[in-house]
Design a protein with these regions (language model features):
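Acidic/histidine-rich catalytic cores and adjacent linkers
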Residues: 20-25, 73-193
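Generic preference for hydrophobic/aromatic residues in regular secondary structure cores
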Residues: 2-5, 39, 68, 132, ...
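Helix N-terminus capping/helix-initiation residues
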Residues: 1, 42, 95-96
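Conserved beta-strand -> loop -> alpha-helix junction used to position metal-binding or nucleic-acid-contacting
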Residues: 15, 19-20, 27-72
Length: 193
């Protein structure tokens, strides 16, 4: 397919891919015949892969996901269902974690200052029984949120400016202030490299 496009309109200057094995092989074969064509990684997929490498080995992350599943099940069909965590997607789940982290942060604040809908009485005991486990993630939630901030800033920059000579330096100056914890600093370096 790539050769067909190249015959019709000339070899592309660059090919953006999501780093899947099949496409990587095709791009590598194409580059043999067209060495001036460069391969660029799709930024959202690249960031999702970096995030997966960061979070998957962390036992706190798997514990958190299991806790979210329990909270989702326990809150269904209750007056607290409006607080249920968003459903996590099996496919491309690391591309959609910002919603889960935002939910956890907002629900954690809700635990401290609950404001129930007008027609729903507050049952503090039930609220704590279902969502109180979020308290044990206070420290790491801030770390995870910083990763989400780094990802969002990177996506915004690349979507607006594209890939260009000097992009690394520009991103470094935008991301360094966001690297305020032990988890974020190496993550910024991985994003930039």
């Amino acid at each position: 397919q790539l050769e067909k496009v190249a015959r019709a309109s000339g070899a592309p200057r660059a090919i953006v891919s999501d780093q899947c094995r099949e496409l990587n092989n095709a791009v590598e074969q194409f580059q043999v015949a067209h060495p001036r064509t460069v391969r660029l990684n799709d930024i959202k997929h690249r960031l999702a892969l970096l995030l997966e490498r960061q979070l998957k080995p962390d036992p706190r992350w798997s514990d958190f996901l299991q806790a979210c599943q329990r909270m989702r099940k326990k809150s269904q069909q209750t007056p607290l269902a409006f607080l249920a965590p968003p459903a996590t997607k099996e496919k491309a789940r690391f591309m959609n974690l910002d919603e889960l982290i935002r939910w956890a942060t907002a629900t954690r604040k809700f635990l401290e200052h609950p404001q129930m809908p007008a027609d729903v009485p507050l049952d503090r005991e039930r609220l704590e029984a279902i969502f109180g486990a979020l308290r044990s993630y206070d420290a790491v939630l801030a770390d995870w949120q910083s990763l989400m901030d780094i990802i969002e800033t990177t996506l915004r920059h690349v979507r607006k400016e594209g890939y260009y000579h000097g992009c690394e330096a520009a991103l470094r100056s935008e991301l360094t202030p966001l690297a305020g914890n032990e988890m974020a600093r190496p993550f910024v370096e991985q994003v930039i490299s």
